A protein has these predicted regions:
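Short, Lys/Arg-enriched N-terminal segments with co-localized hydrophobic residues
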Residues: 1-8
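Conserved Radical SAM active-site core
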Residues: 8-21, 33, 44, 48-130
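A detector for short, charged/polar N-terminal pre-domain segments
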Residues: 23-25
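S-adenosyl-L-methionine
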Residues: 28
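Conserved AdoMet/S-adenosylmethionine-binding subsite of the radical SAM
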Residues: 93-256
């Protein structure tokens, strides 16, 4: 019956590997307390100039899920003083029905919901802010190198899969058009990346004031190496700069 089906849905373990409270570390809402829901699984396999994906446990080697819808509800009730949620990954749009359900649950607890996505697939949700982090060519994995988290050699298959999903401009456009607000938040390794950002803006029709350029890095020293020239570039070109508050504060740690 319907009651049994609903109970089974509430008890089902979902592909969510982390739920915790934190300050938003990036973008226009940086510094605001959030409830973070991390979805496991991603279509991309990012490897940047000096670092791999900062959440390899949700991408290169995705962990199994640990939480249910009831766990999400209970977390909201326990932390009712926080009214912002970010659903991140991994790639949340990989699990469309669950993403929609998480947004519906969040809205019942009066949450302002940010969906952080690489933009590989369009999903219509009740989210408020699409935080779009399109991956530039600086993220393409390099076959033959070692992925530290897994200890395995990066393969040509990893590269092909990454490139297949990296630039889904149609999905990105639909995500922007079908949600109340958005921000474009690309990872920048070098000044040469700016040309790709400008091309992406041209394709998507995104003005500079909606773009937040973010320095690449998993550790403080890596951010420090890029912060000065990237802030100067933002001033010169008219972009927003976003730091990475969680890395500045804690380094490469989980659950922060």
């Amino acid at each position: 019956n319907t009651k049994t089906i609903m109970q089974n849905m509430s008890d089902k373990i979902l592909p969510i590997n982390e739920i915790y409270t934190c300050l938003q570390g990036e973008g226009k809402l940086m510094g605001i307390p959030h409830i973070l829901i991390r979805v496991s699984g991603c279509r991309l396999r990012c490897q940047f100039a000096n670092s791999f994906c900062d959440t390899p446990y949700s991408s290169w080697k995705p962990e199994k899920g640990k939480f249910t819808y009831d766990d999400v509800r209970n977390f909201y009730e326990k932390h009712s003083h926080i009214n912002h949620t970010m659903i991140t990954g991994g790639g949340p749009t990989l699990h469309a029905k669950m993403l929609q359900e998480l947004c519906e649950i969040g809205k019942k607890y009066y949450q302002y919901i940010t969906i952080e996505t690489e933009g590989s697939e369009f999903v219509s949700t009740m989210g408020d802010l699409i935080s779009l982090s399109p991956k530039l060519s600086n993220s393409t994995p390099k076959p033959g190198t070692i992925m530290p988290y897994t200890g395995k050699v990066v393969t040509e298959k990893d590269k092909v899969k990454h490139e297949k999903w990296r630039c889904n401009y149609e999905a990105m456009s639909q995500l922007i058009e079908n949600h109340p607000d958005y921000q474009l938040k690309p990872v920048i390794s070098s000044e040469e990346d700016l040309e790709e950002v400008k091309e992406l803006q041209k394709i998507l029709g995104v003005p500079n004031n909606m773009v937040y350029l973010m320095p690449e890095g998993l550790e403080r020293h890596q951010l420090n190496e890029r912060r000065k020239w990237l802030t100067e570039l933002c001033v010169r070109e008219g972009y927003n700069f976003t730091d990475r508050l969680h890395i500045i504060t804690y380094g490469d740690e989980r659950g922060v």
